[in-house]
Amino acid sequence: MARNSIKKSPVVKKKDTPIVRKRKPIQQEAEEDSNDEESEDELNVEGLIDASDDEDEEEEQEQEEQPQEEENNSDDDDDDDDDDDDNNSEADSEEELNQLLGEEEEEDPSDYNSDEFSDEPKDDDLSRINIKSLSVSDPSIQKNSISKFSDGSIRILKPEIEPKYDSDDSDAENFNTIGNIPISAYDEMPHIGYDINGKRIMRPAKGSALDQLLESIDLPEGWTGLLDQNTGTSLKLTDEELELIRKIQQQENTDENINPYEPLIDWFTKDEEIMPVTAVPEPKRRFVPSKHEAKRVMKIVKAIREGRIIPPNKVKQQLTEEEEEDQFNFDLWQDEIEISDHIMNLRAPKLPPPTNEESYNPPEEYLLTEEEKSKWLQESPIDRERNFLPQKYNSLRQVPGYQDSVRERFERSLDLYLAPRVRHNKLNIDPDSLIPDLPSPKDLRPFPIRCSTIYEGHTGKIRTISIDPQGLWLATGSDDGSVRIWEILTGRQVYKIQLINKEINNEDHIECLEWNPDSSCGILAVCVGENIYLIVPPIFGFDIENSGKLRIESGWGYDTFGNKKKDLKISSQKEEDNKESDNEDEDEEEDNDDDDDDDEPETSSTVEPKKEVAKWYPPNTEQASMGISAIIQCRKTIKKLSWHRKGDYFVTVSPDSKNTAVLIHQISKHLSQSPFKKSKGIIMDAKFHPFKPQLFVASQRQIKIYDLAQQVLLKKLMPGVRLLSTIDIHPRGDNLIAGSYDKRVLWHDLDLSATPYKTLRYHEKAVRSIKFHKGNLPLFASASDDGNIHIFHGTVYDDLMTNPLLVPLKKLNGHKIINQIGILDLIWHPKEPWLFSAGADGTARLWTT
């Protein structure tokens, strides 16, 4: 059948595929042989194949089965023929071959010039067939392209070589090129790095726990159990490394280039030789004394006789004689020879040189009088400032012997061997390096530098001053019992009220006064002894004065002490005493007034209303005509007063009032309450936070910060002083300054520790007042009994990592010191860099730029 196809086929053109047609019968014959062999062992697989296969696959199988059946039939027919038929077919094939050769010779030679036999390459189907492998090439493969250079010459552009397929090192191992980056950086990624071409090296698949167990049981050759950090796979040893380990275990030579069995060269023989190498007899000169040595000996003997050479025994004798002579021959006035001490040797301290009073003829001012002599003799020897009496003699020969010389030498000897010695190394420190690098005060202007106005009129010392929120009126309170209001710019007195009659009451003083921070009401609170006067001075005009009086008068309707608001104490008096004894050592706690309202009365032995900590009284006709709108009476003398920023609350401090030392008063309801059940220590000052619901309470040695909303203790500051005098809070609320009676100014950073950030010691006496500027200027000042005011620049940065900057600017003095009391109070102008001070000399001063 194959032969017939060859005979009938015409001349093959390039568009046909004759090669595939010729190979197809060969494949069919191979398939026929395989089918004959497999027919005997054929299995029945019906029912095992899924009936839902595609129809295309069934058609392909049917087409493949049809030629196979035809070939099988033809093969069966051929098998039935006889040997004679085979011989006839061979003869026929030879005749057909001869006919084909003849037809090829008769072909027209012009056919060789046709397109079929042209040498020019054409883009046809056969051009893509590899003759050796009979495979079709990929049309996407790029070939060389011809271009031209700028000069017109031919330029051949070759396709790019793909390193993965075309280069010779395609079988090289893909090394990871991530460098020193740890492989843990790729834990959350699907790849473990990049190869030399920048392509990702994917993470090898990890088997299950069962696979890992099987791998640990069947250990392959070179297994280490380690993980390769570059590839992420298990690290295996190479054959060379395994061979090296084997040689080390068997103590073999690891380097093949070294020969352990090199030939040994015996440089010395082991046999003892009897006969000498040379048998020359000894010369006579070795047995006769040398003439040359005799000459040298005679020269040495001659030099010894002449004294040019000294024998060793005489040298020692001469040295001893010279030392004996030099022992008493020395220069008395030559410099002292310094001998270096041992490293562990500490020299004895030298005696101090004598002073003028130890002279035998001292000046007259060094001699003691009779009273000083008697006082010196009465004192014990330990308490005496000097251990001798200065005496005067006309000449040195009249000076007697010092009777205490032996005793002093003995005491010094005791001190030298009994007292321990310490070597103190001197520190070579530049003094300029200890001074902090601060900006110049000229760059930090403006700040007050001079006194521009003096407010005179008080007959006693001015204890307190305050300026209204608008910065126009200055109020002063003095020991003469009067409160005066001054116009700041002119120094003119515009209002005066006499609150204390000194003829009747000499004990009370005006301790403090302060304007309400709300400028629309014009209320001035004045503390006189146990009373607080709320005054609206007639200096503002009708609108402001009427607003202030209405705000105070509206609170009389809310005064319900003893009627509506009661605190019902359920426990008996005996239980209350026990509770107070148990809480004696606890810190201060705030009283929760809201919880008291919710408590319902219960049947008990004692039901008492809440005690009044202060009483509110309306003024009489005479007091109302003076501008007084309300009077608050407390239990003890009030020393400090501070307003809340909204102007409805103010806090007062009575140091002698024990558990009611701190009181909070509310104008709108005429209520006074004590926030603490008891106080530990004497309360010196109290202030509200500038914008948070917090209360700062300063006792004698510590400062506590309370949260009024949550009623808890937030922080406790430990200034480390004996007696605090006053505190003030920075307008931002993150810093606090405190003054003490032991001459210290303390700066606390509330974001840091409880100890002070800076402790300033520049005052000579007690610090009475210290204040921050409430405007936008970073200034603060402190006043003391030494009569001086110190102005400081204090910048607080927004960056929490930067510490505040404190720079001293100016020292102001002008007040006189009366009875060791200097300046009592300070206040800053709310807008300008002006400072007001009140002194014990009865004057108030304005310090301006």
UniProtKB/Swiss-Prot annotation:
Alphabetical list of Pfam families matching this protein: BOP1NT, WD40
Domain of life of the source: Eukaryota
Chain positions covered by the region annotation Required for interaction with YTM1: 405-441
Stretch list, region Disordered: 1-130, 569-619
InterPro entries from the UniProt entry: BOP1/Erb1 (IPR028598), BOP1_N_dom (IPR012953), WD40/YVTN_repeat-like_dom_sf (IPR015943), WD40_repeat_CS (IPR019775), WD40_repeat_dom_sf (IPR036322), WD40_rpt (IPR001680)
Major subcellular location class: nucleus
Subcellular location: Nucleus, Nucleolus; Nucleus, Nucleoplasm
Nucleus listed as a keyword: yes
Keywords: Nucleus, Repeat, Ribosome biogenesis, rRNA processing, WD repeat
GO MF annotation terms: large ribosomal subunit rRNA binding; ribonucleoprotein complex binding
Family note: Belongs to the WD repeat BOP1/ERB1 family.
Protein function: Component of the NOP7 complex, which is required for maturation of the 25S and 5.8S ribosomal RNAs and formation of the 60S ribosome.
Protein name in UniProt: Ribosome biogenesis protein ERB1
Organism from which the protein derives: Candida albicans (strain SC5314 / ATCC MYA-2876) (Yeast)
